[in-house]
Amino acid sequence: MSTLSYVSPDALKGWLMESPNEISIIDVRDYDYEGERIPGSVRIPSDTFLASVDQHVDDLMKKRSLIVHCTYSQVRGPKAARVLSEILRNRITESKEKLSLSQKEKLFQNLPTVYILHGGFSAWKRRYGGQQGLIEYD
């Protein structure tokens, strides 16, 4: 399994401005979700992540980058990112189609890159809380 990388709030903002349709942001906050989120993010709470993420996998596989975060991205965000990365890889290895090793490798190379938001939503809010359009409210 590949090593997961972190992305800074500044880099994520750039991606959102340049190519918002190529990324998905997955918010795994639970009890600490207070109705504020990064624009366009999908909320899949960590306490139901394993049971819920599969319904999103087909859409997520169409993206270039997936960014996972919780409040601080210290425990839940990284854990969900590892699980998501494994689920995406398993989707290829468990494919019902008979694929050659080279075909599977090509599919692996085209999987979205899974990132963890450095500092989590807390860092995002601290950096962009006062800027129009960078936080959505329920």
UniProtKB/Swiss-Prot annotation:
Top class in the EC scheme: hydrolase
GO cellular component: cytoplasm; cytosol; nucleus
Stored InterPro entries: Rhodanese-like_dom, Rhodanese-like_dom_sf
GO function term, MF aspect, one: protein tyrosine phosphatase activity
Gene3D superfamilies cross-referenced by the UniProt entry: Rhodanese-like domain
GO BP, one annotated term: cell division
PROSITE patterns: RHODANESE_3 (PS50206)
Subcellular location field: Cytoplasm; Nucleus
One Pfam family here: Rhodanese
Effect after changing residue 73 to A: No catalytic activity
Catalytic activity reported: O-phospho-L-tyrosyl-[protein] + H2O = L-tyrosyl-[protein] + phosphate
Active site residues of this protein: 70
Keyword annotations from UniProtKB, A to Z: Cell cycle, Cell division, Cytoplasm, Hydrolase, Mitosis, Nucleus, Protein phosphatase
Stored CDD domains: Acr2p
EC number(s) stated in the UniProt entry for this protein: 3.1.3.48
Reported function: May play a role in DNA replication checkpoint via regulation of hsk1 or may act downstream of hsk1 in an S phase regulatory pathway.
Similarity comment: Belongs to the MPI phosphatase family.
UniProt-recorded name of the protein: Dual specificity phosphatase ibp1
